[in-house]
Amino acid sequence: MISSSVSRAASLIGRLACLLAPLILSSPLAWAENWNISGQAKYFLSHSRYDADNVFAAAASRSPIDHHLNLRLSANQRWGNRWDTVIHYTASALSADSIEAARSFSALPTLAGYGSPNDDARLFNLTSVVSDQGKNLQAHRFDRLSVGYSETGYVFRFGRHAVSWGNGMIFQPMDIFNPFSPTTIDKEYKPGDDMAYLQNLLASGNDLQSVLIPRRDIASGDLRADESSLAMKYHHYTGGGADMDFLAARHYGENLAGFGFAIDWQGAVIRGDLVNVWTAAGTTVSGVTSINYSWVWDGHNMSGYGEYFRNGYGISDGNYNALALTANAALMNRISRREIFTLGKDYVAGGITIEVTPRWLLNAALINNMNDNSWLAQWVANFDWQENWTVLAGTNLPFGAKGTEYGGIEGATSGEYIGGGKSMFLQIAHYF
């Protein structure tokens, strides 16, 4: 029943695209005056250090250096009282020793997230790779391209867009559409997906969001219900500082239900999400809960959090060799889809933010894989350098024995390891 509904909806959205694409790109709209034009340019530099037995060291260098330049141009306009158009164009260029090393190992793109950007599974192909060889990669794409209609009580949007759900601080089991990695430092924009989005705004202050994301089978290019997503989330404000979320979805051919909450308690906020997925092998439950608190110390604004994450697909015995990973298809599929970023089953994390000055923030985070007792520490300094300029700088420091997630998991060849490298990074951003 749900699968056939997704198929019919995917077919409908394809016909709707043919009708709305000329509306977005036709000259009266695409070249109308009074567009709100803005942009940003970012340069990201990272320098990593690996042990001699790491696969990166064997393929390229023990100290790979990666450069990444990204340009985003944004155009937004409201036309009439109800309609609006959003267009974001991005162009990126990478020169990265890490990419060159990843090409030599078939397991690395899945585990490390490497690979050329593409829209093979999306409804529209809005990405073009200019060059992809050696350590270099250049590509450009439309990351947002949508038309919206708003009325009292509801908002509709069609096209490439992004939604964020979930109540986790760094782990997001309820955010099933392109969530950020727990160690991502720049969370300004999520990758967009081609979708139909409807939000019903109720008089009570509650709302119902519905999302349809049709996807293609990569091999055939055909729209497939078992590759698509249809989800609905109801947000309910109970009063007295409590919010609840109820999620129901059909996602990649599997039924999913979730519950989330956020409660004010003694000046702190307690949050949590619980997600249950029905698969062919049975049910899988993932969840996250956290508490965060803000205070003032010696004239400085501060905030801190503690979080526990249960990865229902994770490996509990700390055995991450190639055979164990291959046998856990559910985990590896979600890692390849960039829905999950961790291998273990149980994690605790904590973090603190200090406002050194109104323009200078220090962030420290610590993640522990409870199943293998490996750790990852991250320090980030965020400096509002001057008007329209920001600087991010920091380090990632893993701790753990060989064979652990953050100490470096065993590669396909005995005695070689993947991951576990220390890194420093710098990002300079200019807004215009």
Q: Where would I find each of the regions flagged by the language model?
A:
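Detector for outer-membrane/organellar transmembrane beta-barrel domains
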Residues: 268-367
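Residue-level signature of outer-membrane beta-barrel architecture
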Residues: 33-35, 75-79, 148-151, 200-202, ...
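Outer-membrane beta-barrel "beta-signal"
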Residues: 383, 388-390, 395, 415-432
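Outer membrane beta-barrel
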Residues: 76-207, 213, 400
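Transmembrane beta-strands of outer-membrane beta-barrel pores
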Residues: 43-49, 91-95, 151-153, 160-164, ...
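Residues that define the transmembrane beta-barrel architecture of outer-membrane proteins
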Residues: 63-69, 138-143, 150-152, 190-194, ...
